């Protein structure tokens, strides 16, 4: 009897101990932080990306790029600091994302793939792109998938494009292509541009951002249907993924994605082959003569000199002797009245013209309503520089009446062309204006500004531009050639 009781007591003690252990283990497991909680606790959102014009890069003003801007907004939503890390290639990106203690997510212009890799998951998509076969102008244009057979083709290793070609190879076993982890999209386009390879496969957004640097590249055909870009997250709980998806859905609904798309892609198609080729030449042959003047004005006025240089190029192609039938003259194409107001005694003197035009632009920008914030403020200032503040105000009022935001360039630029249509300008205070030309003016300046920002990164100074991966066709001289600089516009 006593032995039985003792046995029961021992069993009860064992069960109690086991229960306590399991309870503690359960509590410990329940208290393990989720992916979202870890980010919030650390106060840092670690994001891995690629270094390219379409994703992320650094200029003198700091970090920038479509993916950077979007990730920054997400970090702000979480109330944490954003920390950007860059990968050498896509395999490296996915490897770092999957390792324990790695980045919280990858924002790198990725199209969902790697279905066999359970360690990677993808968010909702946020930007539609189309994969495109790229060839060199002057070569025979492929028009269908079977035309790829026998061509020298290179794509990024580990990319969705490599997966697409692998699928095509099942249908055409003789198809050959190379995957490389030592190049980026910029390098692939350069190789096509100079003839080192025959073809490559890139997404439409990457081509849009880079084509101006490589005027010889052309789209052969779309290789498949449009697909959405997404962020990639490591496997684990859904807490951070749910927050990412909620953010992206809200960004789409509230217009953030459209504004970022307009900022980075809304002006990329303004240069054709001739324009891109000419700009590449002038970048090497003309800008060096006046760069110091732009930099001096930029420093004095606390304004990015490259934006001032972009205005100068749009106005005169950096020609100090430029004139027009309307009487504007000089590198910044100043009217006599504006020149006098800005203290310019000789409009044909490039230094005076740059100083006067720069001062005028900054003055216009400072006079805009405080409700207009950057970067829109600079785009509005460009519009006013071209069309005048009165007509710009007409367009803003028109936007407001249409239920649009009068402080957003994306909305107001839709109204400017109406200023040339009687049914609309008859209702405005200041009447007719060539608003469509102003939209093109702003788009052109923004595109030139983008190019200058990219090619004047710290690692691409001076003669390094000509030797960099950003190929400037036909331009390999570090010293400017002489030209008359007296073309009439």
From Swiss-Prot:
UniProt keyword terms in alphabetical order: Cell outer membrane, Cell wall biogenesis/degradation, Lyase, Membrane, Signal
GO biological process: cell wall macromolecule catabolic process; cell wall organization; peptidoglycan catabolic process
Full protein name: Membrane-bound lytic murein transglycosylase F
Listed InterPro entries: Lysozyme-like_dom_sf, MltF, Solute-binding_3/MltF_N, Transglyc_AS, Transglycosylase_SLT_dom_1
Membrane-crossing residue ranges in chain numbering: none
Region (LT domain): 269-489
Entry text on domains: The N-terminal domain does not have lytic activity and probably modulates enzymatic activity. The C-terminal domain is the catalytic active domain.
Topology in the lipid bilayer: Peripheral membrane protein
Recorded GO CC terms: cell outer membrane
SUPFAM superfamilies in alphabetical order: Lysozyme-like (SSF53955), Periplasmic binding protein-like II (SSF53850)
Gene Ontology MF annotations: peptidoglycan lytic transglycosylase activity
Organism: Pseudomonas aeruginosa (strain UCBPP-PA14)
Region entry Non-LT domain, spans: 33-268
Stretch list, region Disordered: 466-489
Catalytic EC class: lyase
Function: Murein-degrading enzyme that degrades murein glycan strands and insoluble, high-molecular weight murein sacculi, with the concomitant formation of a 1,6-anhydromuramoyl product. Lytic transglycosylases (LTs) play an integral role in the metabolism of the peptidoglycan (PG) sacculus. Their lytic action creates space within the PG sacculus to allow for its expansion as well as for the insertion of various structures such as secretion systems and flagella.
Signal peptide as annotated in the record: 1-32
Catalytic residues, chain numbering: 315
Subcellular location: Cell outer membrane
Similarity comment text for this entry: In the N-terminal section; belongs to the bacterial solute-binding protein 3 family.
Basic and acidic residues bias locations: 478-489
Pfam families recorded: SBP_bac_3, SLT
Reaction(s) catalysed by this chain's protein: Exolytic cleavage of the (1->4)-beta-glycosidic linkage between N-acetylmuramic acid (MurNAc) and N-acetylglucosamine (GlcNAc) residues in peptidoglycan, from either the reducing or the non-reducing ends of the peptidoglycan chains, with concomitant formation of a 1,6-anhydrobond in the MurNAc residue
């Amino acid at each position: 009897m006593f032995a039985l009781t003792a046995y029961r007591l021992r069993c009860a003690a064992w069960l109690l101990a086991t229960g306590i252990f399991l309870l503690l283990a359960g509590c410990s497991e329940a208290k393990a932080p989720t992916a979202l909680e870890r980010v919030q606790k650390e106060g840092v959102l670690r994001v891995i990306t690629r270094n390219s014009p379409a994703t992320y890069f650094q200029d003198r003003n700091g970090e920038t790029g479509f993916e950077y801007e979007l990730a920054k907004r997400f970090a702000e939503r979480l109330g944490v600091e954003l920390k950007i890390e860059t990968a050498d290639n896509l395999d490296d990106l996915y490897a770092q994302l999957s390792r324990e203690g790695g980045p919280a997510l990858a924002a790198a212009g990725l199209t969902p793939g790697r279905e066999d890799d359970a360690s990677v998951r993808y968010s909702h998509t946020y930007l539609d792109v189309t994969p495109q076969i790229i060839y060199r102008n002057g070569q025979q244009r492929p028009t269908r998938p079977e035309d790829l057979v026998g061509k020298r083709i290179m794509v990024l290793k580990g990319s969705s494009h490599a997966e697409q070609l692998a699928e095509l190879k099942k249908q055409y076993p003789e198809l050959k292509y190379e995957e490389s982890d030592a190049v980026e999209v910029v390098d692939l386009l350069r190789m096509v541009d100079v003839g080192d390879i025959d073809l490559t496969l890139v997404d439409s957004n990457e081509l849009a951002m880079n084509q101006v640097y490589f005027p010889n590249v052309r789209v052969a055909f779309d290789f498949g249907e449009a697909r959405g870009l997404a962020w990639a997250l490591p496997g684990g709980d859904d807490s951070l993924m749910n927050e990412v998806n909620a953010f992206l859905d809200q960004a789409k609904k509230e217009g953030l994605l459209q504004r970022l798309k307009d900022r980075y892609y809304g002006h990329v198609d303004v240069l054709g082959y001739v324009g891109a080729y000419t700009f590449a030449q002038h970048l090497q042959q003309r800008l060096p003569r006046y760069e110091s003047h732009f930099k001096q004005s930029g420093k004095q006025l606390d304004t990015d000199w490259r934006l001032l240089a972009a205005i100068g190029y749009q106005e005169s192609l950096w020609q100090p002797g430029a004139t027009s039938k309307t009487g504007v003259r000089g590198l910044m194409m100043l009217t006599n009245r504006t020149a006098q107001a800005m203290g310019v005694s000789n409009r044909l003197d490039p230094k005076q013209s740059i100083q006067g035009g720069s001062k005028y632009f900054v003055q216009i920008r400072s006079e805009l309503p405080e409700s207009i914030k950057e970067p829109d403020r600079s785009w509005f200032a460009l519009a006013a520089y071209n069309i005048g503040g009165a007509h710009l105000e007409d367009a803003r009022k028109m936007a407001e009446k249409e239920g649009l935001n009068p402080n957003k360039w994306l909305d107001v630029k839709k109204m400017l062309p109406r200023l040339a249509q009687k049914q609309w300008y008859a209702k405005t205070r200041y009447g007719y204006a060539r608003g469509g030309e102003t939209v093109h003016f702003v788009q052109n300046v923004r595109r030139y500004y983008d190019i200058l920002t990219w090619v004047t990164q710290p690692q691409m100074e001076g003669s390094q531009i000509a030797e960099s991966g950003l190929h400037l066709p036909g331009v390999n001289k570090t010293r400017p050639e002489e030209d008359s600089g007296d073309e009439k516009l």
